[in-house]
Amino acid sequence: MHAKMKAMEFTDKLNLQPVIRPVPEPQAGEILIQVSAVGVMPTEKVWSTTSHYADGTARTKAIPGHEFSGIVAGLGAGVTGYSLGDAVFGFNDWYAEGATAEFCITKPSNLSPKPSSLSHIEAASVPISLLTAWQGLHVQAKLQKGERVLIHGGAGAVGLFAVQLARSRGAYVIATSSKANIDFVKQLGADEVIDYREGRFEEAGKVDVIFATVAGETLDRSWDLLKPNGRLVAIAAELESSTDPRVKSAYFIVEQDGEQLASLGKLFDSGELKAFVKAELPMEEADRAYSGSIAGNHGKLIIRTTTR
C-alpha cells in the first residue's frame, strides 16, 4: 500500500480543500521533496495552469504553490548532485503539481541547496520572486552600473528583491511604495522612494529602466519616462493577454533555473540579500492565504506544510 500525505487542492469553485493523496514516487530524473514551507501567489487561482494542462485539456483539483523549501526524500534513477536529507529550495514547473502538500515531485534543474542562513520559511519566499527580479533586471533589461532604474512596488515580494539587486549592480534606484513602507524600501537600498498615493513618480525624471510589478494607469504613465533606448519590463499577470504591442514586448514570465538560484542563494549567506516574510500560516489555513485577505506590509505569505 502506498504511503499517504496531506495536501490542499483547488475545488471547482477555486477554493482550497484538504485531501489525502498517495505520496508521489519519483520517476527517472526526478526528486521527491518533503516540503517544509511553500510560497503563496494568490493570483494562482486564475492562472491558466490551474484550470488547464499544457495540451489545453481541462484540469481540476490542482495543488497550488510552485516555490518551496524542504528536504530531499527520494531520488529517481539517474539523479546526481543531491543526496537524501539535503536541504533544498526551488521552483516547480508551472504545469506540475504544486507544493502545498507534505511531499512534491520536482526536477534537479529546478532546485538549489538552501542557503544556510535562511530558515525553510524564509527560503520558501525566495525562488519565484528573486528569479523574477533577477531575470527581469539582468536578462531582459540588461541593467548596467550607473543607470537609473524605476521599480514600481518596491516593498512587494518581487519588488523588494529588485531593489536589492539593482542596488548591488550599482544603479541609481528609484522605487514606489505606500507611505508606510518608504523607510523599509530605503533600508533595502533605494536612493529615492515615492509614495505612490500622494507623490508623482514622473517628477523623478527620465530613467534607463523601468521594472513594473503593476499594470493599469501606473504602467500607462510610465512609458514617457524612458530615455532613448530605455527598457521597460512588466510582470503583472493581467498583462499576459494584452494586445498592446509595447506591453507584449515588455511582458515576461519567469523561468525555472536552478543554477541561477544557486548563484543568487550565496548572496543571502554573504549578507548581500535579505528575505522577508509577510506572514506564515499552517497548511490547514491555505484557503485563507489564497483569499488575499492576510494583512502585512511587505514580503511574501508562506504556508507551513510540516509541524517541524
Positions of predicted regions on the chain:
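Glycine-rich phosphate-binding loop and adjacent beta-alpha segment
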Residues: 214-276, 305-308
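Glycine-rich beta-strand-centered segment in the early N-terminal region that forms part
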Residues: 22-39, 51-95
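A short acidic, Gly/Pro-enriched loop at the edge of an enzyme's catalytic core
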Residues: 202-209
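C-terminal hydrophobic helical "lid"/dimerization subdomain
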Residues: 2-3, 261-308
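Short acidic-hydrophobic, aromatic-tinged amphipathic segments that line or gate anion-handling sites
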Residues: 192-197, 281-284
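NAD(P)H dinucleotide-binding glycine-rich loop of Rossmann-like/cofactor-binding domains
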Residues: 81, 91-153
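Mid-domain Rossmann-like dinucleotide-binding core that forms the NAD(H)/NADP(H) cofactor-binding site
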Residues: 84, 126-195
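Short, polar loop motifs at secondary-structure junctions
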Residues: 177-181, 197-199, 234-241
